[in-house]
């Protein structure tokens, strides 16, 4: 299957492997992502005129809002960042400003491009690493040796490289020069402060950027890989491509958008900080220029997907200007008992398959009877009804509770086949689910 030019039908088919139901949401998102590809096939003048139709996803937690957007961005290899609206404060207050989400997107985009370039140069990087280690292991030739000696040395070097590549010398120790660990820079500060931080680091680390270390050949391979990658990669080209890709095909997923909506119950927009964040967000969604450490980026062609449960507020509680910037609205369905069962049995990497794989590491073969899976779905659904509805996330905690003893005593079950029955599920969970006061402990 192709990636960037996947059709909406192909996108939905891919999502169906991981997410059950939510047909309307999948369809809307698939069309929005396909339109990104369509726009890039047009003439430059027309490309500038076409802006993405931002999406507002409405649905309870755990119904698949984030997963739908994340899965598509991953398969199509698009710059993607997920942020929470409630983490931001308006300009002038202590906290993260909304422009930092664009800076995070650019950081992710540059990293994505860098990894692609590393993958293309993978063989070349490995060859350079192996050659450098081989030359460390073999003593250098003295000056003025004969051609015959030079040929012998070249043959020895080649054999040494082959042995290093095959891992035969992984345990041998060598002394190499490696770069000192760089100081972490906070990328969420304004670009002006970021540049000051970078300049200070350059000044203090100019002369002391390398140290000698004794490492095993295996460790040296990893240490030298990053260093040689930097020398072979064109960092400026990567930065420019990362900026361009973030600008033309970036996706920002804003979760918990309902947390910055001012509910009418709270009294006619009396929370200035929430409304302030909305007003700060507005120019970014509409289209503005944001300065990052890699350069300036225009935001009008970034696709924004906002999501929220809207239990205590309504989409209409957002300021009208922001509502207008999310013209496509999709309501996601709450999960039924049947959908819970399908999530456990039909998804490509279902929770059951994950736990089976984890316990197989300990030599324990876990099998679930169909009645046991149905009981898990039923009890998880009932827990959601009696307590907070956390959607599919409830399945993680119910299965964890059922398998708790087996996971803890895994070495006692090593080499055995363990079958999870309906009765076992009931004995582990039914008392808790039946008691409404204890439901809250099955998070």
From Swiss-Prot:
GO terms for biological process: protein unfolding; proteolysis involved in protein catabolic process. Keywords: ATP-binding, Chaperone, Cytoplasm, Nucleotide-binding. Gene3D superfamilies: 1.10.8.60, P-loop containing nucleotide triphosphate hydrolases. ATP binds at residues 20, 62-67, 255, 321, 393. Signal peptide: none annotated. It is found in: Cytoplasm. Its main location: cytoplasm. GO terms for cellular component: HslUV protease complex. Pfam families: AAA (PF00004), AAA_2 (PF07724), ClpB_D2-small (PF10431). GO terms for molecular function: ATP binding; ATP hydrolysis activity; peptidase activity; proteasome-activating activity. It comes from the Bacteria. ATPase subunit of a proteasome-like degradation complex; this subunit has chaperone activity. The binding of ATP and its subsequent hydrolysis by HslU are essential for unfolding of protein substrates subsequently hydrolyzed by HslV. HslU recognizes the N-terminal part of its protein substrates and unfolds these before they are guided to HslV for hydrolysis. NCBIfam families: hslU (TIGR00390), PRK05201.1 (NF003544). Belongs to the ClpX chaperone family. HslU subfamily. A double ring-shaped homohexamer of HslV is capped on each side by a ring-shaped HslU homohexamer. The assembly of the HslU/HslV complex is dependent on binding of ATP. This is ATP-dependent protease ATPase subunit HslU. It comes from Helicobacter pylori (strain ATCC 700392 / 26695). The lineage of its organism: Bacteria, Pseudomonadati, Campylobacterota, Epsilonproteobacteria, Campylobacterales. The gene is hslU.
